Amino acid sequence: MQIAVDLITFLNNPRPTMKKLLITLFAGLGISVQAQYWQQSVDYTMDITMNVENHQYDGYQKVQYTNNSPDTLQKAYFHLYFNAFQPESMMDVRSRTIVDPDRRVTDRIYGLGSDEVGFQEIRELTQNGMPLGWEVNGTVLKCTLAEPLLPGESTTFEMRWNAQVPKQIRRSGWNNKEGVEFTMTQWYPKLAEYDEDGWHPDQYVGREFYGVWGTFDVTVHIDKSYVLGGTGYLQNPEDVGFGYGGVKKVRLGRNELRTWHFKADRVHDFAFAADPDYKHVQLQIENGPLVHLLYDPKTANEANWIKI
C-alpha cells in the first residue's frame, strides 16, 4: 500500500521527464504482457441423430482446432464425460468412498442398469483425412497426431461415435427430477484445453469443466414430437414450428425425424434440452433480445409463465 502511495506522490511531482519515462515504462509493460497472452480456439460442426426409445444417439463432428500457442503439438485429448456414469468408474468409486460425497451421487452410479449407464464409443477418428489411432482411459481419449500442429496453424479432426445418454444423476442425462426427458450438457467428445501449463486431460469425477472457447454449428435429428431449446440461435424455424419464428406447425411424414439446427459463437459448450411435453413461448424484449421460454405445463406453474 505504501508503494502505491509513494507512486501517486511521485506522479504528482512536477518532474516531467521522469514522469514521462515512468508512464512509458508502464505502457510498454502492458503491451508486452498482452502480446504474450494466447488462447486456443475451436470450431465444432456436428450432426446428431437421437433415438428417444433407447436413449442413444449416433454422432458425427468436424473439429477445426487452431493452435495459438508457441508450442508444436504432437498429440491431442478429448473428454468423454458420459463414460463417468458407469459402475466402477473413477467417479463412481470416489463418490462411494469419500467422507463427504455429493448427495446427488453417493452410490447411484453403482446401481445403474445396462440401459441406464452412459458411454461414448468412438468408431472413427481422422486428422486432415488421415486415420488416427487412439486409446481411451476412463473419461479421456488420447491420440497421437498424424501431422504435428505447428504454432499459428490449424488442423481438422473428424470423428464418428455412438453414445448412450445416462439416466440423469448430475447435469446431463435423461428423465431428470423435473421430468425433462433429455438434458444434454458435456454430451459430445470435447477437445481438452491446452494452455501455458500444457494439456488438461483431467478425468471427470464430478468437478467443474475447463475447455476451449469456440463456435458450434449443431444439427440434431430427433422424434418429431420433441421440442428443443439449445445454445445460440435456431437457424431453421420454418422447418421446426412450435412457435419458433412465429411458425406454429410444420407437418412431417409419419416416421420422419424433425431437424433442429443451432449456431452459437464464442461459447464454452453447447447444451440442449428436449422433451415432448415442452411448451415454447417467445418474447421480444423492447430494445433487447428475443427470449425463449420452454416449460412443461403439467409440472410448471403455467399461470406464472404466462405472466412473464
What is the predicted role of each segment?
Residues 62-84, 89, 100-103:
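Ligand-binding face of N-terminal immunoglobulin V-set domains in extracellular IgSF glycoproteins
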Residues 33-58, 178, 185:
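N-terminal, polar/Ser/Thr-rich
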